[in-house]
Amino acid sequence: MSITKEFDTITAISTPLGEGAIGIVRLSGTDALAIAQSVFKGKNLEQVASHTINYGHIIDPKTGTIIDEVMVSVMLAPKTFTRENVVEINTHGGIAVTNEILQLLIRQGARMAEPGEFTKRAFLNGRVDLTQAEAVMDIIRAKTDKAMTIAVKQLDGSLSQLINDTRQEILNTLAQVEVNIDYPEYDDVEEMTTALLREKTQEFQSLLENLLRTAKRGKILREGLSTAIIGRPNVGKSSLLNNLLREDKAIVTDIAGTTRDVIEEYVNIKGVPLKLVDTAGIRETDDLVEQIGVERSKKALQEADLVLLVLNASEKLTDQDRALLNLSQDSNRIILLNKTDLEQKIELEQLPADLIPISVLTNQNINLIEDRINQLFFDNAGLVEQDATYLSNARHISLIEKAVQSLEAVNDGLALGMPVDLLQVDLTRTWEILGEITGDAAPDELITQLFSQFCLGK
C-alpha cells in the first residue's frame, strides 16, 4: 500500500455550474476539516465521526453573514477517494452560492484545484491506478449504458488485474531466464531456457492479441460511430435524423437544398453511440452557401465510420444517386430505400440486394437499421459480454500494440538463434510498456497531460 503523500489542501465546485437542486463544493487535504470548520456553524467538524453528514450553515467568518443552509459530509483519511481528509459541502444549487462558498474556502487557506487534481491525488496516493483514473472520465463521458458498463468494469480493476498479472508472469520468466544464465554448467540449460522463453513469449503474445481483438468493439462503445447520412437533396435525410433522434433537430421541407450545413447529434442505438451527421444534399449548385455545405458533406463522408445512403423509392435513379453509390461503395455502408409508402419507381435491379426499404413517414423498418449496424460492426456477437475485459482507450490500444511488437521481436530472435541474454531486452521492454498502461512506468509528463483533460472538481 502506498504511503499517502503530503499535499496542500485543494477545493473546487464538483457539480456543473448553473441552477439546480444541489451544488457540491469539495475539499481534500490535511487541513480540509479545519478550513471547513472555519466557515461552518454547527457541530465541530474536527470532532465528528468519519463518513457522517452534518447539518449547519456556511457563514462568512469576517462578518458573520449566513451564506447558505448546508449539509456537510466528512470523510477521514485513508478511507476516501483521495486517501486524504475530504469534506463535501452540499449547498443549494446555483452559481452565486457555490462560488461564494468556494471563495470563502480559498480565503481560509485552500487552493483552487487544477482540473482532475482530486483523481490525480487518488492515483498518486495509490487509491487507483492510471487505467482506473481514466475510467472515471469514461464514466462521466459515457453516452450509453454499454459504454458505462465497460468503464465501470475498468474502474473496478478488470483491466488493471489482467495487465498486472501479465507483468508479474513476465517478471517471473525473466527471473527464471536469469537463473539459467547464471548456471551455465548444466548441459541442457541453454535448450531449456530457449524452450521456456519460446513458450512464455507465445503465451503472452496470444493473451495480448486476444485483448486487442476487443479494441474495435470497445473503442466504438467508448467514442461512438461517426455516421454520415448522405443522399441527394430532399430524399428524407433530415427526416431520418429526426426519426432516429425522436425530436426535430433538422429542418424538414419539400424544398431541395434546405440543409445547408452539417448537423451533428448523438443517438443511442441499442447501446451504440452514433454520432449522426446529417449532411447537406450532395449535388452541383451555384448557391455559394450550399456549395460550402456540399463540400463539408463530402468531407464527412470520407471521415465516417458508417454511411447511411438514403435513396428515394418513389423516383427513378438519377446521376446524383449513381455518383453517391460509387462514392460510398468502399465505406461501411447501409443503403436505405426511403418513401416505400409511395408508388415505387426506382430500378431495384440496379441496386445492391442488401438494401433496407424504409418509410421515415410511417417509421417502417427503422429497427432493421439497428440490426444491420450490429452485423457490420459486431458480427452479430452482441455488444458487451458481461465478464469480458475490453480495450476502449486509444492510449491503451497503442501500448498493447507496442508490447505485441516487442514480443514478436523475441520470437524472431529465437527463430534466428540469437543469444537469450539479448532477447531479455525485448521481453523487459514488454514489461515496461505494460507498466505505462497502469501508470507504474508512465512518465510524469504523460500523467500531467492525462489529468489535465479532467473537469474541475473531479
Swiss-Prot record:
Report the CDD domains cross-referenced here.
Answer: trmE, TrmE_N
Q: Which residues bind Mg(2+)?
A: 238, 259
Q: Which UniProt keywords apply?
A: Cytoplasm, GTP-binding, Hydrolase, Magnesium, Metal-binding, Nucleotide-binding, Potassium, tRNA processing
Q: Does the keyword Coiled coil apply?
A: no
Q: Which Pfam families match?
A: MMR_HSR1, MnmE_helical, TrmE_N
Give, as one word, the top-level EC class: hydrolase
- Where does the TrmE-type G domain lie? 224-378
The UniProt GO MF terms for this protein read: GTP binding; GTPase activity; metal ion binding
- Named cofactor requirement(s): K(+)
Compartments it resides in: Cytoplasm
Q: Which GO terms describe its cellular component?
A: cytosol
Record: residues binding (6S)-5-formyl-5,6,7,8-tetrahydrofolate? 26, 88, 127, 458
* Record's cofactor remark: Binds 1 potassium ion per subunit.
| Chief subcellular location | cytoplasm
What biological-process GO terms show up in the record? tRNA methylation; tRNA wobble uridine modification
List residues traversing the bilayer. Answer: none
Which residues are involved in binding GTP?
234-239, 253-259, 278-281
Matching entries from InterPro entries are given as:
G_TrmE, GTP-bd, GTP-bd_TrmE_N, GTPase_MnmE, MnmE_dom2, MnmE_helical, P-loop_NTPase, Small_GTP-bd
The entry's K(+)-binding residues are: 234, 253, 255, 258
Instruction: State how it assembles.
Output: Homodimer. Heterotetramer of two MnmE and two MnmG subunits.
Family to which the UniProt record says this protein belongs: Belongs to the TRAFAC class TrmE-Era-EngA-EngB-Septin-like GTPase superfamily. TrmE GTPase family.
Q: Which NCBIfam families match?
A: mnmE_trmE_thdF, PRK05291.1-3, small_GTP
Q: What does this protein do?
A: Exhibits a very high intrinsic GTPase hydrolysis rate. Involved in the addition of a carboxymethylaminomethyl (cmnm) group at the wobble position (U34) of certain tRNAs, forming tRNA-cmnm(5)s(2)U34.
Protein name in the entry? tRNA modification GTPase MnmE
* Species this chain originates from: Streptococcus pyogenes serotype M12 (strain MGAS9429)
Q: Which gene encodes it?
A: mnmE
